[in-house]
Amino acid sequence: MKIILDGKEVTAEAGRTILEVARQNGVDIPTLCHVPALEPAAMCRLCTVELIENRRSRMVTACNYPLRGDAEVRTDTPLLRQGRKLIVELLHSRCPDSEVLKELGVRYGAELGRFPDDNKDCVMCGLCARVCERVGGNVLALCGRGVEIRVDTSFGRTARHCLGCGACARICPVNKIQIRDEGNERTVIIYGKEASRIPLRPCTSCGTPFGPVIDLSLIMERAGEAQVPAFNLSICPACSRRNHARRLAERHFEQYEIEPHEAGEDD
């Protein structure tokens, strides 16, 4: 089917979202809550675009709106830029030290600091809760309603069944989730509060704690499956690299036999 994207005719596959079609054609639509590996949730609203179908214009979120027929999409009109400017200003009040929001502020001419800082340290994109569910941790979830919505653990208690994989921290667009390894435990910190605490497995070679017990146990359970290569999960990455390098060196030098140097031979 044919789509008019910012005045240019492009071909699109039915069922593809506006965001997918835009990116395939080199059009940049800003997002904070979208990751291709997760189902779109349209939480941040930065990807709002203007859609014209059957002579009717309306605003839709590009990340989760599938195209079903010929249409026109406008991604960068003055009205859209004004809306994104306001969204960035509001989100910046929640995370005033976020570099991502500062960059978006420059892009859309936002008046950062227009709204009082409330330092919530969260833009409510929901990515951490969604990826936690996806990997099977089910530790984090969106709790509350309306302006009181927040990311939290069950009953606000420190979770002990967390995998400790760190996916929540890596996916956070404003880098507000902290992973701390102290002693034999890993702690996940959200809103400055301890969300989970997980024991770390010590390396059998050097004794250094290197990975969450629960996360490594799941990997070891799957190590016999065809799609998962077998690794020695009882030693840390540093010892594993050192052992691998030693084996490679021994294998390489076994090919050469060093002849003893005879006295009187020409050097």
Regions found by a protein language model. Give the residues of each.
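Extended, charged low-complexity segments
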Residues: 242, 249, 265-267
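Acidic/histidine-enriched, beta-strand-rich ligand/metal-binding domains
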Residues: 214, 218-230, 262-265
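Long, low-complexity intrinsically disordered regions enriched in Ser/Thr, Asp/Glu, Pro/Gly
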Residues: 254-258
